[in-house]
């Protein structure tokens, strides 16, 4: 099955995980408590798509979609959103469509677990925080398992 065909399954898996009591856990990859990149990596891994562990590694692994100053109209469900500053990617989420995305965020600037935020105009403080830190987006177009690449 092609990666794009698995995206609805991946998004459903994340939605299911969000319904289980969870908190943000730095380094969390096993659930129910995840950090941002652990959630994304585990969601893809559960559907036999192997991607890197950390947000900056995932950013390098993805096919580039847009930079923060460009329009994000080309986003598709399952695209990966990268947050941080021009020097460093330090947060990641996955686009669920219609301007919304899933991510696991901490309690200081987030929802202390898996939540949904928006790229649309809003008054929500958490969404606004992450909108200000959006730097780019990418698309998972391949899987790797050590040195073996598959599509």
Stretches found by the model and what they are:
Residues 1, 75-78:
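Loop/turn positions that initiate beta-strands
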Residues 1-21, 146-151:
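Intrinsically disordered, low-complexity
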Residues 20-76:
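Catalytic cysteine-centered active-site loop
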Residues 65-70, 96-151:
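Aromatic- and glycine-rich peptidoglycan recognition patches
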Residues 74, 87-89:
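Short glycine/proline-centered loop/turn elements that form peptide/ligand docking sites
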Residues 80, 89-102:
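Catalytic nucleophile-His microenvironment captured as a short glycine-rich beta-strand/loop
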């Amino acid at each position: 099955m092609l990666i794009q065909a698995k995206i609805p399954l991946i998004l459903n898996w994340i939605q299911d995980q969000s319904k289980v009591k969870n908190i943000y856990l730095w380094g969390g990859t096993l659930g129910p408590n995840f950090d941002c990149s652990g959630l994304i990596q585990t969601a893809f891994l559960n559907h036999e798509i192997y991607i890197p562990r950390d947000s900056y590694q995932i950013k390098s692994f993805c096919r580039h979609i847009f930079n923060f100053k460009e329009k994000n109209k080309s986003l598709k469900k399952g695209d990966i959103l990268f947050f941080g500053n021009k020097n460093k990617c330090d947060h990641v989420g996955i686009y669920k469509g219609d301007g919304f995305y899933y991510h696991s965020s901490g309690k200081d600037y987030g929802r202390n677990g898996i939540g949904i935020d928006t790229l649309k105009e809003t008054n929500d403080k958490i969404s606004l925080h992450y909108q200000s830190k959006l730097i780019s987006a990418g698309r998972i177009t391949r899987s790797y398992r050590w040195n073996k690449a598959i599509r």
